[in-house]
Structures are given as C-alpha cells and as structure tokens.
Curated annotation (Swiss-Prot):
This is ATPase family AAA domain-containing protein 2. Residues 801-825, 917-943 form a coiled coil. Belongs to the AAA ATPase family. Pfam families: AAA, AAA_lid_3, Bromodomain.
Length: 1091
C-alpha cells in the first residue's frame, strides 16, 4: 500500500512540475510578442522548425486553462475517484509501456485537430484514460539451437578483450530478488480479466515436457548403449536422475548355471518370464495370465540378488528380449512431497512402454513397510501408490515385479496376495547337496579341478554357510595358497614374476580359511544343527544312525528328505512330486469327457480331489515327537541332537530354548513361544527344537507352560511339525505334563547308551598310534621358498587390437587432431591478421637479404606454420609453440640490437611469442593437451604415422632451404625413439639360491625381511635325525586306555582324549618318542573319573 501511494504521489508531483514549467514558458512567449521581437518572416521561419513544439505548447495551455476552470470540480470528485485510482494504479503501471508507445500517435491526432482549428475549451484534464483490455497471446516458441561446446575452449575468445557473462545462477541480494519479482509481476499481468485456460495449457505443456524428460532417465540395465542410442542421448542431455539409475553394474557372466541349489526357484522364474514368451499359445488356450509378481525372502547372502542378476542376463539373450529394471529400496524416496510417487509411476510407465519387462526391487522393505498409525504418512502414500500400480484399475500388462527382502514381517501385508506378489520364495541356508553344487560352481575354472570327494567332505563341514560364505571361503583358500607359496610379495610394492603353475590349493588352505572366517549365520545366533566333528565321529556315529532310524518311523518325512537314492534319469526337481507326475488314470473334469451315465455317477458317489488322503503320494505322520534321553554327560544335547538336526537340514528348524524366550526384553516369553510355533506351522514340514526340556520346564512359569501345551495341541494331527527335545533325566523322572507329550509305546523315546569297546578303540586309535608316532614338522621347504629372490616383472604388454578396433581407434584419434588443427588455424589466423606481425607472415626473400640463409639454419614463418598444420605435422600444441619460438629466436638472432628498425622487429617477435602463448593458455583446455600427448605416444608405440591422414594432393612450390624439408627439430615423429622394454630376468630356483648365496643375493634376501640369511642357512644345514618310536608300547597303551574307559561317558572320554593330546603337543619337536610314551602312560594311569 505504501509503495502504491508513493507511485501515485510521485506521478502527481511530476505532472504539477510540468504544468509550472509550461506556464512559465507561455508567459515568456507572451512577453516577447508584446515587445515585437519577432517579425512576420522570423515568425514564419520559427514556425517552420518549431511547429511541433508550438502545437504542444498550445495544447498544454488549453489543458492548463481547463484544469484551472475545473479545479473545484476535480477536488470534489477526487474523493470519489480515490478508491478507483488506487485500484487502478497497478493496472496503470502495467500499461506504462503501452502509454509511452502510444504517445506519438496521440500527438499526431492532436496536431491534426489543431490544424483544423478545432479547440475544445470544455475538455478536462485526467491522470489516465482507461483502455480496452488486450488479452495475452502466447508467442510461438522458437527452437533453441545449442551450440556444441568446443573441446579445447575453456575461456574467453581473446586475452585482450575477455568476455564476461552475467550468470543468472549467481547469488543476489534479497532486495534484488524482491524487485525482480515485483517487476515481473507488473509487466506480466496485462489484465486482471485474463483467462486461466492459457496458464493451464502452459502448465500442461511444461508437465508433459518434464515427464518425457524424466521417463528417459529410467533405462533397463540389461540393454547396451548402442541398443538404446536415441534414449541414451536424451538421457545424457537431461543429466543424472533424482534416483539412483544404475544402482549396480550388471555382471553379464552370471547366468542360471552360475546359481547352485536353487533349481526350484529358477524353474518358477522361467514359468513367469520365459515360458509366456516362448509358448504364448498355452496361456492363450486357457485364457490365463502367468504370475506377475514374486517375493524373495530369506537371510542375507543366500542368493536373492544373484538370482535377479542371472534372470536379467537370461532375459538379454535371444531375439525377443526382456527389459530389466533394477531399483534399490530407497532409490525412489525423496524429500519432496509427491516426488516418490511420481518416480514410481514413471518407472512403471517406462516398463510398460518397453514391455515385456521386469522390475526388481531390492530391499523392498525400505520402500513398502507396514502401514500403521505411528508411521510417517509419506510411507503410507508410497505403499498405496505401489499397490495401485501393481494391481489397480489399470492393468500393468507384461510387467513382472520381483521384490527381495531380509525381513518378511516388515512388508505391508497388502502386497502379499495374488495379483501383486503371487509367489513367495524362501531362500534358506543351503543343505549339503546345495553347498556341494555351489562349491563346484566356484571351483569349475580351477586348473587342476578339485576332487569330487573332497568337495563332498568340504560341503559336509560347511554347516550353516551361505552361498556368499562359500564363495568367500574359496577366495580365502586361494589367498592362503598364494601366501604360502610366495611370501615375498607382501614385502614389496613392485610386481614380481610369479610361476602360477606352482600355486596349488590344498586341503589345509581350506582349513585355514574356515578358521579365519565365521559364517554370517553364526555371528549373531549359532545354528542348532552341527555335524559331528572328526574327533567324536568314530565315537557317536553309530548312535546318530540309530536315532535317525527311530526318527524315520515317527516322522516319515525324514526318510523322504534324507533319501538320496533317486534315479539319475529323473533327478530333475520338477519330477520329484509323485502326485503331479504319476501315470494313474484320473477321471475327466470336462463336460464332454464323460458319458451322461458316468457323469451322473461321478456327481453322486465320486470325489475328484484327494487332498491329504492318498498315502501313496506323500508321507503321513500323527503328531511326530521324539525325546532323546540320557544320563548327564552322554552328549545328547551337545553332540547327538545337533547331528540329527544337521542330517535334517532341509527342514526349517525353530529353537525354543531359554535364551530365545528370555533374551529379548521387548516381547514376553509367551509371545515369543506363540510366534515360533506359528511360524513352524506356516513353513511345515519343520522342526521345533527344545533342548534340555527338564530344565526348561522347571524355569518357565505356568502361563508359558499352558501356552506351550495349548499351541502344540492346536497343531493339526497330520501336520508335519516335529517336536525334538533332549533331557538329562529319564522319562519316568520328568514331570507328568512332559511325559504326556512323549509316549514310549509310540517309539517317541530314545535312550542313549554308552559307547562300546569298538567305538572307544576307533576313538583313541588315531591319536595314540598315528599322531604320537608322527615326526616333527619340517620347514625346510618353506625356508627355501622364503630365500627365493623373485625378479621384478616387466610392464605388461598392451593388448593387441583387432582390425576393427584399430580402425575405430584411429577415427577417434583423427577427430581429436581435427579439433587441434582447427584451433591452431584459428590462433595462427589471429596472429597473421595483426598488423604488428605482418613481417612474420611470409618467408624472408633471399634476393633482399642474401646473408639470411647463412645466418639462420632453420627459417620459419607463419605461412610455413599454416602449411605444416595442413600436412598434419602438429600432434600437440607443444610442437606448434616450438615453431613459434623458432620464429622469435630467428628474428632475435638475425636482427641485432643497434638499428631502430631491428629493434622494432625484435620487439614484435617477442610480442608474437607472448601473444601466442597467452592465447593458447587462455583458450586451450589442459585435458585436451594431455589427450593429444597420449594419442601421440600411442601412435608411436603402434608405429602409426600422422601423414597417413594428410591431404593426398597438397603440393607446395619447392623453395630453397624450405622449412618443410629436413626439419628434424620440429617434427615430433623424428624427435623420439621407441623404448624397448628390457628382457625379464629368469627366475632362479630355491636350490640355486642355496648353492650360490652371493653378497648381492644375500642383500636382496635381507631386504625382503622374511627371514635372516644366517638363521635360514642354519636350518637348511641341520641334518635330519632318525625317528625313534616304540610301536609295541603304543599298542599296549591303546589297550590300556580302552580297558580303563569302559564305563566312561562322552564327556569323560573327551577329557581323557584332551590329556593325551596335550602330551603329544608338548613333545611335538622330539625325534625320540620314548619320553612321550612315558608321559602318556603316566597321565593315563593317574587319570580319574572324578576329574
């Protein structure tokens, strides 16, 4: 309001001042007329040049008279017009430009009126005249032609007159922003009654253009750049997306054959993606749609993302390819309101346009969490948008959506239904066969390949290892082999020559790798399943086999999962289902498949479906439960039950022990118990493991006991949920409620017995007869390898390029040199047209200066420089500046500093040099100069000449002492010579190191800092003594140990085994084992069960 009043007051003041000036001018003219200063001739001459001004004066006088006559009425009407003028101020200001443009027209009209002699004495003076509203018409947008940026241009065109451009993105004061905003509002609002349809159309055009630009940012990962040239160019113009467009680089070598242990999941993905493309007639016949969504869930490192990558590569093969889009969970999230939903819509639109396509959401729990009242509303909006896009009113067509998560409970339940995520694939820990297959995949490129029996044993020991853990073990084993064979590489930063054939991975490398790495599944919670160790396996393997045999009678599914005697012809996982692939005749379900009589009979007395009632198709059990009972120390909880669970590792195991119930303070024990049993029912067949149930039952309260028994009773009778428990008390000593859970008559009780004589003999035989008689470890081979001096490896040879690659490379290099020549011509032209440097544009005439050739050996001028540019003699700017320096040095050398003319030439030569350097420094990009030098070096190595691309018919008139002939200084191709790499030094063998330990070799070995030479030579020079072992005494000691341990339990046997092992470790360096045998006999005799 203050601003509007200020404008109004200022306008009135200006008009009042103009009226006063015109009055004074009119009064002066009257005085001159009264004095008779002008005669008629002068008056006519004056009117000839001041006719327009006099007309203006006359009009001003008339208006002034009218204003004086109507001043009273104007003051009365001022109050009435005040509100109208205030409301029109903004419009009047907006029309200032139009009024200024129309002033000339108004003046012409007034002139014509005055010439006719018509004067309106009754006309009143007004500040503004309202005009008719002129509606805004949007001008046609002219296409903007973006000039291609020059690769060598990084500054102004001239160092003398630099160009400055005001950047609109620079910081400005708030006052300037406010003034610009107000000025834009004044000049952009032509009329208050303009229609809003124009703005809406403009907004729609902008939104459409923005949408098209944003869609081009979403490109599939499995398409190459040359396959999407148009889209890729648009994307490069647009720039980076708000989301992470390339969250990971897609490894094209990962295929379905690189995924082990997940054949069922791969077959299901083929049904969803591959089969609809290959066999569309099948789906067309039954008018069905294949599943369009699946959810991968499971612990980290089990292959969820790996399967997605393999699927992307499989979809990239063949004629009809599938576009694969990959997004991480938080890629679509944005701080701007509505931007996340917009990116999701754009993603699905782009996938629909490039259908068939796949959208893979990694870590989808971060994108679509469970909606709740305590959650931020932005996530609820994103989840709602994703739900509508996956299965809303608009069909998403041939778009398959795959989600991966580690937390299935954190995903919104609305996503987990058919139509959105039709299938859910559990990526559990791999079993023995899957681990063996994964090991084969990671070691199939090794030379030599490991034995199949070794891989089977390794897979058996890798319990709880995931696919990522197994891959890490293979890599760590290879590093252990490298560290063992060549320890020298860890003491130097230079690359040494290695004999790759001497690096062999052994079993001990895998042992060291497994000791170093802890599986991810065992870092937080240790898996209950664990195979018997090699130490106790001879002692307890028979007991484990008996438990499994008893378990198969109670839980027939165990036989189904542990039986590996499938025919090799039908080993395909798709043929494991007897119900789906049986050859039994089944009645037809079609109307025309049965006669009328048989159809009526089928409707009355025949059932088509036999769900859970056919014993031939699947095993059946009634409330499977088993209790392993033994005395304390029999190993039922520490060895036997984990071994049984390991044998049944294909089943999902849920542990319900004391730490699980009371370890989490956020939930009550009853809630934890209910959740465990609920999950066991959902993932049946499964196992509920309750270790030490006698202690468990004494600690928990009555509420948890009632909850546990009630949940067990609510499990269906034929549900394959096994309850496995262990107890250190006999069945009769347990509480009555526990006894009712396990019935002895049903074979649900297994009593553990003490190991027999044969098991104990196998248990101690290896320790006493083999390990006690083993000679000390020799390290001479390791010392020889440490003394080996490895030569420095030569630089790697460049990869030989094919003819097509060489051609493409030369074309790229020639494009770069073309830019260089254009730049050098521009610089030379700017120097040549300068009048100061006209003397250097042409060669020196020998007729005018006869002694010039004798003084200057290498003449040079700007015309010769232009000729060398045309002949492709300049590969870098340094070569060009070298000739500029030559022009300057020749001028300084030939023109002495005596004559004023010579001084002027010397001055202009220095100015030429400085100007050339200044222009190049100002306008040349440093990266472009470095690129030219690299190309020059590459051409020298390849032996490629730059004259190959020079003009074919570029002839120059021969001149004596031409600078183009024999110019060795300025030709970059003749300045340097290729450097041949030195021949590598032959690697010496360890035996040669020992036989010839010279002073130089000694210093090289000491620089490696692996072992001192004196100590190494002392170890190698020591003779190997003979081994002294009394095998008869060892056999007698074994018999004594077996006899004494007749009534020992598992813990006591392990204790005795540890005592004997300590004796062997203390005498591990002795070649005479007599003292060791005496020590073992003494320890066995003093060993007591009370320990």
């Amino acid at each position: 309001m203050l601003f509007d009043k200020l404008i109004t007051n200022t306008a009135e003041a200006v008009l009042q001042k103009m009226d006063d000036m015109k009055k004074m001018r009119r009064q002066r003219m009257r005085e001159l007329e009264d004095l008779g200063v002008f005669n008629e001739t002068e008056e006519s001459n004056l009117n000839m040049y001041t006719r327009g001004k006099q007309k203006d004066i006359q009009r001003t006088d008339e208006e002034t008279t009218d204003n004086q006559e109507g001043s009273v009425e104007s003051s009365e009407e001022g109050e009435d017009q005040e509100h109208e003028d205030d409301g029109e101020d903004e419009d009047d200001e907006d029309e200032d430009d139009d009024d200024d443009d129309d002033d000339d027209d108004d003046d012409d009209e007034d002139d014509e009126d005055e010439e006719d002699g018509e004067e309106d004495n009754q006309k009143r003076y007004y500040l503004r005249q309202r005009k008719a509203t002129v509606y805004y018409q949007a001008p046609l947008e002219k296409p903007r032609h973006q000039r291609k940026p020059n690769i060598f241009y990084s500054g102004p065109a001239s160092p003398a007159r630099p160009r400055y451009r005001l950047s609109s993105a620079g910081p400005r004061s708030p006052y300037c922003k406010r003034m610009n905003r107000r000025r834009h509002a004044i000049h952009s609002s032509d009329s208050t009654s303009s229609s809003s349809s124009e703005d809406e159309q403009h907004f729609e055009r902008r939104r459409k253009r923005s949408r098209n630009r944003a869609i081009n940012r979403y490109l599939p990962l499995n398409f190459r750049k040359d396959e999407l040239k148009g889209i890729y160019k648009d994307r490069m113009k647009i720039g980076a997306s708000l989301a992470d467009v390339d969250p990971m680089q897609l490894d094209s070598s990962v295929r379905f054959d690189s995924v082990g242990g997940l054949s069922n999941h791969i077959a299901a993905l083929k049904e969803m993606v591959v089969f609809p493309l290959l066999y569309p007639e099948v789906f067309e016949k039954f008018k069905i749609q294949p599943p369009r969504g699946c959810l991968f869930y499971g612990p980290p490192g089990t292959g969820k993302t790996l399967v997605a990558r393999a699927l992307a590569n499989e979809c990239s093969q063949g004629d009809k390819r599938v576009a694969f889009f990959m997004r991480k969970g938080a890629d679509c999230l944005s701080k701007w309101v509505g931007e996340s939903e917009r990116q999701l819509r754009l993603l699905f639109d782009q996938a629909y346009q490039m259908r068939p396509s796949i959208i893979f959401f990694d870590e989808i729990d971060g994108l679509a969490p469970v909606r709740s009242s305590r959650q931020d509303q932005i996530h609820s909006s994103i989840v709602s948008t994703l739900l509508a896009l996956m299965d809303g009113l608009d069909s998403r067509g041939e778009i398959v959506v795959i989600g991966a998560t580690n937390r299935l409970d954190a995903i919104d339940p609305a996503l987990r239904r058919p139509g959105r995520f039709d299938r859910e694939f559990l990526f559990s820990l791999p079993d023995k066969e899957a681990r063996k297959e994964i090991l084969k995949i990671h070691t199939r490129d090794w030379n030599p390949k490991p034995l199949d029996t070794f891989l089977e044993e390794l897979a058996e020991n890798c319990v709880g290892y995931r696919g990522a853990d197994i891959k890490s073990i293979c890599a760590e084993a290879a590093l252990c082999a490298l560290r063992r064979r060549y320890p020298q590489i860890y003491t130097t930063s230079e690359k040494l020559q290695l004999d790759l054939s001497s690096i062999n991975i052994s079993a001990k490398d895998f042992e060291v790798a497994m000791q170093k790495m802890i599986p991810a599944s065992q870092r937080a919670v240790t898996s209950p399943g664990q195979a018997l160790s090699t130490v106790v396996k001879p002692l307890l393997q028979n007991t484990v086999d008996k438990i499994l045999e008893a378990l198969q009678r109670v839980f027939p599914h165990a036989e189904f999962r542990t039986n590996k005697t499938l025919d090799s012809d039908i080993s395909c996982p798709l043929l494991e289902s007897d119900l789906a692939y049986s050859d039994d005749d089944v009645p037809s379900v079609y109307e025309n498949g049965l006669s009328q009589k048989s159809s009526h009979k089928a409707k009355d007395n025949f059932n088509f479906l036999h769900l859970n009632r056919n014993a031939c198709y699947q095993p059946m059990s009634f409330r499977p439960r088993i209790l392993i009972v033994g005395e304390p120390g029999f190993g039922q909880g520490s060895h036997l039950a984990p071994a049984v669970i390991h044998a049944l590792e294909k089943f999902t195991v849920y542990t319900l022990d004391i730490p699980v119930l009371f370890g989490v303070s956020a939930t009550s024990p009853e809630e934890t118990c209910a959740q465990v049993i609920r999950e066991a029912k959902r993932t049946a067949p499964s196992i509920v493991y309750v270790p030490h149930i006698h202690v468990w039952w004494e600690i928990v309260g009555p509420t948890l006991k009632a909850t546990f028994t009630t949940l067990l009773q609510n499990i269906p009778s034929f549900a394959p949920v096994l309850l496995l428990a262990t107890s250190d008390k006999s069945h009769s000593a347990l509480p009555e409620e526990v006894q009712e859970l396990f019935i002895r008559d049903y074979g649900e009780i297994f009593n553990v017995q003490l190991p027999g004589k044969e098991e104990r003999t196998k248990f101690f035989e290896d320790l006493i007869l083999k390990q006690a008689a083993k000679p000390p470890i020799s390290k001479k081979k390791a010392v020889l390898q440490a003394l080996e001096v490895l030569p420095v490896a030569p630089p790697p040879e460049p990869r030989s390029l094919t003819a097509e690659e060489v051609k493409r490379l030369e074309e790229q290099e020639e494009d770069t040199f073309r830019e260089l020549r254009i730049f050098l011509r521009n610089v030379t032209h700017r120097l040549a047209i300068d009048k100061r440097f006209r003397v250097f544009t042409k060669p020196v005439d020998p007729d005018e200066v006869p002694d010039y050739v004798t003084v200057i050996k290498q003449p040079m001028d700007l015309s010769s420089v232009i000729s060398k540019i045309d002949l492709h003699k300049y590969l870098t700017v340094k070569d060009y500046l070298r000739d500029i320096d030559l022009i300057c040095s020749n001028a300084l050398e030939y023109n002495p500093d005596r004559d004023p003319g010579d001084r002027l030439i010397r001055h202009r030569a220095c100015a030429l040099r400085d100007t050339a350097y200044a222009i190049i420094k100002e306008e040349l990009d440093e990266d472009f100069e470095q690129l030219c030098e690299e190309i020059q070096e590459s051409r020298k190595k390849r032996g490629c000449s730059s004259s190959k691309y020079a003009p074919s018919y570029y002839h120059v008139m021969p001149k004596q002492n031409s600078t183009l002939v024999g110019d060795k200084r300025s030709d970059p191709e003749q300045n340097e010579k290729l450097k041949t790499p030195s021949t590598p030094v032959a690697c010496s063998t360890p035996e040669m190191c020992v036989l010839r330990m010279t002073r130089a070799r000694r210093s090289q070995v000491e620089q490696q800092q692996l072992i001192s030479v004196e100590k190494a030579l002392a170890i190698l020079s020591q003779p190997t003594p003979s081994l002294v072992v009394d095998h008869e005494r060892l056999k007698n000691l074994l018999k004594t140990v077996v006899k004494k341990s007749r009534n020992y339990n598992i813990f006591q046997l392990e204790n005795l085994y540890a005592v004997i092992s300590q004796c062997i470790y203390q005498h591990r360096k002795d070649y005479d084992k007599t003292s060791l045998i005496q020590k073992m006999e003494q320890e066995v005799e003093n060993f007591s069960c009370s320990r």
